[in-house]
From Swiss-Prot:
It is an enzyme of class 1 (oxidoreductase). Keywords: Fatty acid metabolism, Lipid metabolism, NAD, Oxidoreductase. NAD(+) binds at R223, G224, I225, D244, D267, V268, N295, A296, G297, Y360, K364, T395. Restores respiratory growth of S.cerevisiae oar1 deletion mutant. It comes from Mycobacterium tuberculosis (strain ATCC 25618 / H37Rv). Belongs to the short-chain dehydrogenases/reductases (SDR) family. It comes from the Bacteria. InterPro entries: NAD(P)-bd_dom_sf, Sc_DH/Rdtase_CS, SDR_fam. Coiled coil: none annotated. This is 3-oxoacyl-[acyl-carrier-protein] reductase [NADH]. The active site is at Y360. The gene is fabG4.
């Protein structure tokens, strides 16, 4: 799916010829046009350097050598290459003094990181460290990657991946996460921390079609982010069951037709919602679905002192109670079983809060609660659950924000711009992949490393 053109007038102006010149003269930060996924294009625009002395250097090289231009590590050399990605394996750092390795690896090569480059640090889960000093050193990696993300320019991003120390030497569960981060699919994911468990993974037959043959339920699919999720899922090979309320029937039918899926008119807050979805699955898909995306959501903004019961209750019902009921119901009746994927839509408002949105922020923080509370029990059934928390995304809702507020909101992140619905959809598709079976309980922001929140 081709990326949509940005509706951000400021970015269009300062990236134009005359506008770019004027912006440089005035010292105005210039948002980079982010490189997003296009079928057939290489994952990175330059070579990939993998360094460090940890346990995943060689497994990563073996997993990625077919699709990436790998180069060797030469810490003392001068580089003529423009790197597309830099990966540092920090799993071998067991003492705080060993953090010097970060400086030694990155400092000589950072200036050679190309436009929209990727920086990924792989560490070990701090809570599972073998010693106090190792735990301290591994926890320190988060401050490094978040700070580096705020230093990089030209659309480059950082990420930290914590790998379970119980992962087998081949670390196959790490591959899907690394492929996502080292690609244009993660264009608006910056400064985030991913946790990968010990489970092994089997790569898909085709990394371009990782969802081939899967059945995906997407609520709130008539328009906006939900419709884009459906498009990305279909691109990746899934059959989409697109769900929305009957008042959105025309848009829902358009979405379903566009992606070759099926439309189901349904109020997710209805008492019989689980039964109707299960019936649809029995009639069309042998009673089973592989993926559930709890995307449906509404806003009813008001200062709490002025908020009536109707506004509070409606947001709670759609955004929090319905996702919990659907998840527990569809897992409980076997519609989603072993190998299943559940992904919830949280929001940066649920992390940082937002004035006038106590109801909305409560539900989006609650979505994080659903993810973290259900993850252990679902893992025992072979099901993963993760959440995506979008920041400022260019949608009809954000387009209605007053101009001055909208422009400020767009700039308050390391990438100096708003994201696109496809950025959210790509993160959800990564979580939905069968190869992401070692990834559960994560809450990942798609926010360009927003300055607010954690």
């Amino acid at each position: 799916m081709a990326p949509k053109r940005s509706s951000d007038l400021f970015s269009q102006v300062v990236n134009s010829g005359p506008g770019s010149f004027l912006a440089r003269q005035l010292g105005v930060p210039q948002p980079e046009t982010l490189r997003r996924y296009r079928a057939g294009e290489p994952p990175l625009t330059g070579s990939l350097l993998i360094g460090g002395a940890g346990r995943v250097v060689e497994p990563l090289r073996a997993a990625l050598e077919k699709d990436y231009d790998l180069v060797g590590n030469n810490l003392g050399g001068r580089w003529a290459d423009s790197f597309g990605g830099l990966v540092f394996d920090a799993t071998g750092i067991t003492e705080p003094a060993g953090l010097k390795g970060l400086h030694e690896f990155f400092t000589p090569v950072l200036r050679n990181l190309g436009r929209c480059g990727r920086v990924v640090v792989v560490g070990g889960t701090p809570e599972a460290a073998a010693s106090t000093n190792e735990r301290i050193a591994q926890r320190a990696l988060e401050g490094f990657t978040r700070s580096l993300g705020k230093e990089l320019r030209r659309g480059a991003t950082t990420a930290l991946v914590y790998l379970s120390p119980d992962a087998k030497p081949a670390a196959t569960g790490l591959e899907s996460t690394m492929r996502f981060l080292l690609s244009a699919k993660s264009a608006y994911v910056d400064g985030q921390v991913f946790s990968v468990g010990a489970d092994d993974s089997t790569p898909p037959a085709d990394w371009e079609k990782p969802l081939d043959g899967k059945v995906a339920i997407v609520t709130g699919a008539a328009r906006g982010i939900g419709a884009t999720i459906a498009e990305v899922f279909a691109r990746d090979g899934a059959h989409v069951v697109a769900i929305d309320v009957e008042s959105a029937a025309e848009n829902l039918a358009e979405t379903a037709s566009k992606v070759g899926g099926t439309a189901l008119w349904l109020d997710v807050t209805a008492d019989d919602a689980v039964d109707k979805i299960s019936e649809h699955l029995r009639d069309h898909h042998g009673g089973k679905a592989d993926i559930l995306v709890n995307n449906a959501g509404i806003t009813r903004d008001k200062l709490l002192a002025n908020m009536d019961d109707a506004r509070w209750d409606a947001v709670l019902a759609v955004n929090l109670l319905a996702p919990l009921r659907l998840t527990e119901g569809l897992v409980g009746n076997g519609s989603i079983g072993e190998g299943g994927r559940v992904i919830g839509l949280s929001s940066i408002a649920g992390i940082a809060g937002n004035r006038g949105q106590t109801n909305y922020a409560t539900t989006k923080a609650g979505m994080i609660g659903i993810t973290q509370a259900l993850a252990p029990g679902l893992a025992a059934k072979g099901i993963t659950i993760n959440a995506v928390a979008p920041g400022f995304i260019e949608t009809q809702m954000t387009a209605a924000i007053p101009l001055a507020t909208r422009e400020v909101g767009r700039r308050l992140n390391s990438l100096l711009q708003g994201g696109q619905p496809v950025d959210v959809a790509e993160a959800i598709a990564y979580f939905a992949s069968p190869a992401s079976n070692a990834v559960t309980g994560n809450v990942i922001r798609v926010c360009g490393q927003a300055m607010i929140g954690a």
